[in-house]
Amino acid sequence: MSSGNILWGSQNPIVFKNSFGVSNADTGSQDDLSQQNPFAEGYGVLLILLMVIQAIANNKFIEVQKNAERARNTQEKSNEMDEVIAKAAKGDAKTKEEVPEDVIKYMRDNGILIDGMTIDDYMAKYGDHGKLDKGGLQAIKAALDNDANRNTDLMSQGQITIQKMSQELNAVLTQLTGLISKWGEISSMIAQKTYS
């Protein structure tokens, strides 16, 4: 098993091969010895559990990064709409302003809906040659804010999940340490009895 399997962000599948014990003519093969040794089996199970928890945490970490980036990018577009709304507010109630092309493209690419409509459908229904009144501009900003908030929430939930996975990793490591300690004690006692 390569160390790349347990690094943050690794997408590699978990591969684990049980190879505990020693192999020589007196003791038989490694597999025979590990099957007879409950400590080796326990150690193997805990290592597999450790790798599984780590893989889940890795995937969640990648999700958190994506959600954070999406929330940040969406908030930038929302701030851009603030400027357009402020410009529209300087005119009268019928003043219309153009929705920035990069905002339209961003909403289209990320599937952000306004009142259940795509940005293209919304512009076709309420737009006037790519321009919207203040209410329409505010509806677009609200849709962007909702998307940013949703991704921020997903990011927070992901961080909580990672914290829980870290606690589970620590618990498994504690169990591994205890098992290795007991394994060593028993091996030492057997060696003393055998060779004394």
Swiss-Prot record:
It is found in: Secreted; Cell surface. GO terms for biological process: protein secretion by the type III secretion system. Induction: Expressed when growing intracellularly and is maximally induced 6 hours following infection; expression in host cells is dependent on an acidic environment. Repressed in conditions of high calcium and by osmotic stress. Its main location: secreted. Keywords: Protein transport, Secreted, Transport, Virulence. Disruption phenotype: Mutant is severely attenuated in virulence. Disruption prevents SpvB-induced F-actin depolymerization in human macrophages without affecting intra-bacterial SpvB protein levels. The keyword Transport applies. May form a complex with SseC and SseD. Binds to the chaperone SseA. NCBIfam families: PRK15364.1. Belongs to the EspA/SseB family. Effector proteins function to alter host cell physiology and promote bacterial survival in host tissues. May act as a translocator that mediates translocation of SPI-2 T3SS effector proteins from intraphagosomal bacterial cells into the host cells. SseB is required for correct localization of SseC and SseD on the bacterial cell surface. This is Secreted effector protein SseB. It comes from Salmonella typhimurium (strain LT2 / SGSC1412 / ATCC 700720). The gene is sseB.
